[in-house]
A protein has these predicted regions:
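Short beta-strand/loop segments at the ligand-binding rim of alpha/beta enzyme cores
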Residues: 37-50, 94-101
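Catalytic cores of alpha/beta
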Residues: 8-20, 24, 30-33, 50-65, ...
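C-terminal helical cap(s) of enzyme catalytic domains, especially alpha/beta-barrels
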Residues: 36, 113, 126, 130-150
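Short beta-strand elements of ligand-binding domains
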Residues: 4, 23-25, 45-46, 100
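Short, small-residue-biased leader/transition segments that mark boundaries at the very start
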Residues: 1-7
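Short, acidic/turn-prone active-site loops that include or flank metal/cofactor-
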Residues: 26, 48-52, 73-75, 126-134
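Short Gly/Pro-enriched loop/turn and capping motifs at secondary-structure junctions
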Residues: 74-75, 97, 104-109, 130
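Active-site rim beta-loop-alpha module in soluble metabolic enzymes
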Residues: 72-84
Length: 150
């Protein structure tokens, strides 16, 4: 019963706010993700990365999510603003496209442009692009995107 209640709330929330994707940062199982996706929701499943071994069990989510998000492992869910060793991305051999998160800042474009993983689909920009929690600095984002496109 609890699962159905959470599933129903997720659908209503996504519909009410016209969300294109839902990003999951918890301990959701592949089955739970599959059930959410079966309702028509598109999912980004976040994985905490601290070492190469952290990529080993990600494959069980391949069929239940639309994208993966690789973020720095930390105590709390949702990110720390710190960067993990991005050279470890070479350990990811899956076919699911992923977004990179964790420690990306306005000065990251030169380093990000050097990343050549075939499944890298984009970047998750958060706290370092905000003037206050939840409010993006449009000028900072514009500058970042210009630098990334150079």
């Amino acid at each position: 019963l609890e699962f159905r209640r959470v599933l129903f709330r997720s659908e209503i929330f996504a519909d009410r706010f016209s969300l294109d994707y839902i990003q999951l940062h918890g301990n959701e199982s592949p089955e739970y993700c599959h059930s959410l996706r079966a309702t028509g929701l598109r999912l980004i499943k976040a994985f905490s990365i601290a070492r190469r071994k952290d990529f080993e069990n990600i494959g069980t989510y391949e069929e239940s999510c639309d994208y993966f998000l690789f973020d720095t492992k930390c105590e709390q869910h949702g990110g720390s603003g710190n960067q993990f060793d991005w050279s470890m991305l070479n350990s990811y051999k899956g076919k699911k496209p992923f977004l990179l998160s964790g420690g990306i800042n306005p000065y990251s474009p030169p380093t990000l442009k050097e990343l050549r993983h075939p499944q890298l689909a984009g970047f998750d920009l958060n706290s370092r692009f905000e003037t206050k929690p939840g409010l993006k600095d449009v000028e900072r984002l514009r500058h970042f995107l210009e630098e990334l496109r150079k």
